[in-house]
Amino acid sequence: IPRFTNKEDLLKNKEIELVLIADIPVKRAALAIECMNAGKDVMLDKPGCTTLEQLKEIENTAKKTGKIFSIDFSERFEVPSVQAAYDLIQAGEIGDVVQTIGMGPHRLNIHTRPDWFFDYDQYGGILCDIASHQIDQFLFFTGSKNVEIINSSTGNFSNPDHNKFEDFGEILIHGDKGRGYIRVDWYTPDALPNWGDGRLTILGTKGYIELRKYVDLVGREGTDHLFLVNNKKYEYKNASKE
């Protein structure tokens, strides 16, 4: 695999069709636009941008160049329990999806973080940074195309030394095919054996599914714990083994 010491050589290389971007969030949009103008498709780590102005520029560039702009929402693409839940919903196990409740707690590990991590202008705020995962899953599971943010709030309740940092956020969403609530934070306690107890509850007209994606507080080992309840079943699945 060839290595490049500068961006210009990479963009000039005709053999490269796709560029992956994981720079500081505020810089990702400009890099994506530059790559698309150079004839490359792009995939970005989330968040793909930090402002609406950046998003509009990205959309205009993608339309002008015909190149693909995509974001790697790893919680949907790479977490087995999320795919397992989708398969159960497609099989009719909980009827029509009415609501998602997405929880995204994270461990801060404050002494390992670079300065930009605490600067709102650099990372886009907690709803942009973390809750983009939960918004993506809301859209995915409800199928909503037209969405309104009914209410959102953020706060800094535990990190007074970083006044441009948000350590808590929540969103209430209404879509044309469902409702959603999201809560994200940087409060994972040290005793938890991993970085966060991420959960997703999907409510349907005939049942519901709860995902405990990364840890089960009851004590089951591993990840991707799925609970299904409907009119005929009340069961647990280890989705990591499916």
Could you tell me what each predicted segment is?
Residues 2-61:
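Beta-loop-alpha module in the N-terminal Rossmann-like domain of NAD(P)-dependent dehydrogenases
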Residues 26, 49-110:
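A contiguous active-site-proximal alpha/beta segment in oxidoreductase catalytic domains
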